[in-house]
Structure formats: C-alpha cells, structure tokens
Amino acid sequence: PPCPRSVKIELTARCNFNCSFCAPGYKLRDKRDMDWGFYRRLLKELKHQGVEEIGVFYLGESFLLPWLPEAIKAAKDEGFDYVFLTTNGSLCTPEKVDACMVAGLDSLKFSLNYADEEQFASVAQVKRGLFGDMVRNVKAARRIRDQGGYDCGLYGSYIRYDGQQGERMR
C-alpha cells in the first residue's frame, strides 16, 4: 500500500499532564524519548517513501524535549514541506516557541480542553497555576509569530468535556 501523505512521530512518550481523557494504554508505556539517530533515519526513510508532512508529536508533550527545535529543523532540511506540532501549551515558553518557529515550524496547535482553571486542575490532574502559564503561552505564541514575521499557523482545539470521557475510555 502507498505511504500516507502525513505522519506523526512521537518524539517523547513523556507528558507533564495526567489527563483523565488520555488513552488509557498511554499510561502503561515507558516514558522515554526517541533516539536522535533513529529519528534522523526515520525522517530519511519517510521522505524516501513519499511522505510530505511530519507531525512532531503524538501522545507525549514534545516541548519536554530540549532538542525539539533541532528536530523541526532536521525535518525541514530533509525536505518536508510542512512540519506541525500539537501541545498542551504549558511548557511552550516564548523562547521555545521562537526557537521552533526559527527552525521552520509551519503549524502550532494548542490542545485547550479546559473551560476554566477548576476544570483544568480536575481533568489534567496538575497544579491550577499551570492554567495561567498555558494561557500566557498561547498569547505569547501569537505575539512572537506576528513580531517575527514567521509563517506559522496557530490553532486551538477543544474537546467538550462532560466529566465522563475518562470512564468511557476505560
């Protein structure tokens, strides 16, 4: 069968949240990062097979990786026209976002699955204060993109959470 046009690569299996709606099997996996050499080899093979777009995320939080900007640049250098990323937003500081945009990130999506700080603390199962960090980081990303003149789409996604998703997924 032909290779898909777009592929997501999970650079890390680590996440700083513990969301109740996240895939239950995720919590059973080793929380490790992908080997850099393996990542580079994977990029070459995917490009050779005709993949056009690379997502540098899956279930883990890619902003935990110190080499995320280098991973984005490596994908662009390999010839991928579109490199995208989804984040929970809590760790994408202005400095990290700027580095990713400089590296060539084409799309940054924020997974904003919480209506307010209370729901955030309950669903993500982390400190309430991270909600404010997340909101500030979303606003900063737009400012950085606009001031730097970067061609990076900024998006948000939201799952309407009724409190039962976690139970239904078990």
Language model regions located:
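Active-site loop signature of alpha/beta-hydrolase-fold enzymes
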Residues: 17, 115-117
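Conserved strand-turn element in the central/C-terminal portion of the radical SAM core barrel
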Residues: 83, 87, 137-168
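Conserved alpha-helical substructure of the radical SAM core
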Residues: 1-107, 122-126, 132, 136
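Short, electropositive alpha-helical surface patch
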Residues: 72-75, 112, 161-170
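Histidine-centered beta-alpha loop that forms part of the nucleotide-sugar donor binding/catalytic region
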Residues: 58, 87-89, 112-115, 159-161
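Internal catalytic or translocation cores that form aromatic/hydrophobic pockets or channels
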Residues: 107-110, 117, 156
